[in-house]
């Protein structure tokens, strides 16, 4: 959104670590560390866009797909904020499971509520790799445009070019400290990245754990990462050194 030209009036996030990261990288932004359910959108009436990613577990195929019965479902809160802020547009993203037939009634209910507020709603499954991102990341994007502006909106067309491979994209970083295996790594990393599987607040994600386990390094480095894994304190490794 920043690259698209938007200025952020407020960012609401519950996780302290995520808020700390935002404040570190964007100190001028208004980061509000709080539960979205307690956030009052009325002071922000007239903003251009309400955007966010509501929790995915209620709709994920990896979970029970409880939808509205899941206490983590924040679509109602997003609609409340749209009602309070009355932006020109709303954009929300979620997992592809939201388009499953089991959620037809749920999506229809969301559309009905947005139409009642004066918006033209639409859903689409978009894949980041179709737009130049070197990762397989399909996401359902919901867009609601204020009725008087809806005629000017169209969904983006996929690019005709393939995104760079992970090796092409990250080779210079992997070679930054003189790692002799960087060229071979580039050849082996000849595809885009898979979807990274996240974890809960208390456990590391499955993909992150697998990548950490397979990371190159001397025995002492592998031992340290093993301890970090057991403590759910996984962190991305720095660029490999020439001794690796």
Where are the language model's segments positioned?
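Conserved SAM-binding strand-loop segment of SAM-dependent methyltransferases
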Residues: 28-35
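Conserved acidic E/D residue at the C-terminus of a beta-strand in Rossmann-like folds
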Residues: 12-16, 93-94
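Short alpha-helical
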Residues: 16-17, 105
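Short beta-strand element of Class I
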Residues: 8-9
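Class I S-adenosyl-L-methionine
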Residues: 39-49, 54-226, 231, 241
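Conserved SAM-binding loop of SAM-dependent methyltransferases across substrates and taxa
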Residues: 1-4
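Conserved SAM-binding loop
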Residues: 22
């Amino acid at each position: 959104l920043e690259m698209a030209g938007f200025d952020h009036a407020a960012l609401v996030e519950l996780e302290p670590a995520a808020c700390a990261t935002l404040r570190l990288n964007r100190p001028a932004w208004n980061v509000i560390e709080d539960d979205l359910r307690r956030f009052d959108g009325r002071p922000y009436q007239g903003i251009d866009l309400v955007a966010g990613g509501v929790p995915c577990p209620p709709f994920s195929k990896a979970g029970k797909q409880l939808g509205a019965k899941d206490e983590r479902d924040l679509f109602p809160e997003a609609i409340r904020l749209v009602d309070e802020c009355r932006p020109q547009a709303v954009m929300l993203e979620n997992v592809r499971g939201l388009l499953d037939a089991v959620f037809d009634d749920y999506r229809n209910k969301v559309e009905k509520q947005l139409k009642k507020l004066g918006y033209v709603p639409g859903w689409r499954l978009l894949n980041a790799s179709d737009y130049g991102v070197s990762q397989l990341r399909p996401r359902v994007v919901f867009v609601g445009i204020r009725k008087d502006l809806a005629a000017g909106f169209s969904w983006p067309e996929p690019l005709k070019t393939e995104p760079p491979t992970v090796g092409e994209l990250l080779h210079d970083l992997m070679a930054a400290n003189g790692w002799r295996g960087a060229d071979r790594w580039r050849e082996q990393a000849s595809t885009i990245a898979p979807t990274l599987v996240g974890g809960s607040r208390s456990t590391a994600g499955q993909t992150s754990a697998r990548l950490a386990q397979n990371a190159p390094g001397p025995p002492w480095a592998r031992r340290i990462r093993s301890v970090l894994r057991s403590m759910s304190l996984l962190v991305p490794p720095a660029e490999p050194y020439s001794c690796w």
